[in-house]
């Protein structure tokens, strides 16, 4: 019998906190064979990422402490190897894709410079050959007009495009083992399918092992040969994928398999006047060229979107990465310039200047996809949630603000006693609740939710959806829900707009669009979900 490519043997990892060591991974044993995929599954905080980061000793020590066990690659210990040995393995033989692309991409450098650095360091390639390889790899991961996009900076790409660039960067080294930590979380279903197909193709081509960390069980069904399920730092089940998915033995695994979003949107209040009316919304960014950076053309990213939204109603914006979903949200918030009419509660917003918009701002709030980016790590929860009150209700005393913060924390399911903690001390689901509380404290009429559940595991996702529905019924909130997860959209939204490259492909009542889609692109999205 051939030895495994990667063997994790009885690994235990903890974090030192003052005089104590808190264990986070407890006696984990896993194997990844060449040419096979092991899916590591579990909810937020289960120890998946700590296990993955330990393979290349990427955890800072201290505070991380390796308590017992070993990690072997081709039979050789990585855990106890010299730093020089590990440096030779990192990138060359074992590559890693992280969940948040902005952590891995340098905002100050173009894509070409960052990709070229990988090829020159790890494969010794130079100018023209390296450029051809870069363009080919970007094409393979679905970046349109790859040769032109090489000049772009990370901030000029959509979230999904940044994720694809990061995957391309890891694959350029042609590694023997690829560790992928939630690499498709931010991607729409069509791009997700494309990336999974690419990973399978590269596995066959390179006989590459793949450790795939995810909370998305539909991906596990499509990709994994074996599955290990983690809970509270322990591996509770480890079997071949077909066996585990058809006949799970552990109650936690059974719970995960039954946690897909279900249910219907909340009932609509009758006889409501429109809260938001949007007519022919259009967003175009200038294309500048030459030394003087003169505008030579415009790139239309959102074109001719119209809809009406009532109190207590949810509109879903669906489409692949770069389709204009988030840009539409930014335009409605008046954070970027747009054309067309935006009427909020009878008042036209498109003619108001910044000062005139201020009284309206507290009534339109936003919750972003990644709470790690949207919550200031230097502020505690009390300071984060009360920030809007300081701007919009400056006459409130500190005690009054704190009382409101405690009340809204209870409303979103957070313990008010934790208000003096910092974001890093909370799980992903708890951080998203903090973001919802920050929006809710200003008593808005409309909340724009930009992929608020895509980075959360299924069990936490279900809890956040239940919270959003409860708040919607209680406060008659209107939502604009931006998502690529069609299961979530169907469970929450009353009407839906399907976008592709800034154009409306299909629009209508959610149930009608899902049960009888009229357009081929909508049918394709539904088939892939």
Predicted features and spans:
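ABC ATPase "signature
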Residues: 235-239, 247, 504-508
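Conserved ABC ATPase "signature" region
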Residues: 129-148, 399-417
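ABC ATPase NBD coupling module
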Residues: 64, 78-95, 113, 121, ...
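A short, proline-enriched helix->beta-strand linker immediately N-terminal to the Walker B motif
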Residues: 172-176, 441-445
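Conserved ABC ATPase signature
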Residues: 152-157, 161, 422-426, 430
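Conserved ABC transporter NBD signature motif
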Residues: 66-77, 340-349, 360
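A short, surface-exposed alpha-helical micro-motif characterized by mixed small hydrophobic
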Residues: 220-222, 489-491
